[in-house]
Amino acid sequence: KEYGAKEIKRPDNIAHDESTSEEALIHAINEIERDNGKIDLVVFLQGTSPLRSSEDIDKAIALFINNQLDSLFSACDLKDLMVWKNIEDNLTSINYDYENRKRRQDMQKQYGENGSIYIFKPKVIKQNMNRLGGKIGIYIMNEWKIHEIDTKEDIGICEYFMNKKELVKNK
């Protein structure tokens, strides 16, 4: 509150374990626009993906504006990971053809959403019930910024990186 932040309480129908971020975002957008008029963009920073700097946020916003995007997400280079899924004990490769396996160096670049920064126009989420849509852009972050907090162990990993000032500075 000291810096102008305002709490927006979710109504009970979107304040349970199965509620989506999109529901909460649409509610918040509607509340803000009701009180302050139309807004141009939303910058959504997930608390469970804390490895970002103010410079990351500024650069992502500039990329969004300069490229006239409708939505943008932050991501990290997956460094040629070969990903599989297991459905009912049936393994299937997701991002490459294992029967025609290429060298990792010859694979196309792939990125993983890191959940750290999302920027979008309010109309995108209102029309699609999704924070991504229209002309989508990507803001690439350092690989170590892919960590999320989902477990107690993740807290320690993120704290490690957050305390490494030589890594965080200008990255």
What residue ranges belong to the model's regions?
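Conserved core of the sugar-phosphate nucleotidyltransferase
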Residues: 2, 18-23, 41, 47-136, ...
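Alpha-helical architecture
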Residues: 46, 119, 148-152
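Conserved N-terminal catalytic core of the sugar/cofactor nucleotidyltransferase
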Residues: 1-38
